[in-house]
Amino acid sequence: MTDFSKILDKARELEAKMKESQEKIKQIEVVGSSGGDAVKVTLNGDGEMTNIHLSEEILKEEKGIIQDLITAAHNNAKSQLKSKTSEEISKA
């Protein structure tokens, strides 16, 4: 086998691993929370918000507090997603 053939084989192998990682990343789901779990935000592997949960107690709070808690929960989920995505890519 020539050096060029070895390089091509390695490239194909790496491409297959990256595609596999991308598929696994799409399956990731993370839940970020804030306010002692009063607010929970779920993100999928593409970073899209798929769910938001607000406890009954939190709905009694002022609008600004609720907005801050939603933002914090989203940022928490985004941080988790970034970590899990990096972890998955490093396996490739």
Regions inferred by a protein language model and the residue ranges of each:
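Long amphipathic alpha-helical segments used for membrane anchoring, targeting, substrate engagement
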Residues: 1-31, 79-92
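Generic, ordered loop/turn and secondary-structure boundary motif
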Residues: 2-5, 26, 55, 59-60, ...
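Residue-level signature of catalytic and energy-coupling elements of molecular machines
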Residues: 11, 47, 70
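N-terminal intrinsically disordered, cationic/polar leader segments
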Residues: 31-52, 58-61
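Short, charged/polar low-complexity linear motifs in solvent-exposed/disordered segments
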Residues: 33, 58, 67-69, 84
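Juxtamembrane/interface motifs at transmembrane-helix termini
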Residues: 36, 71, 86-89
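Short, well-ordered alpha-helical segments
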Residues: 62, 66-81
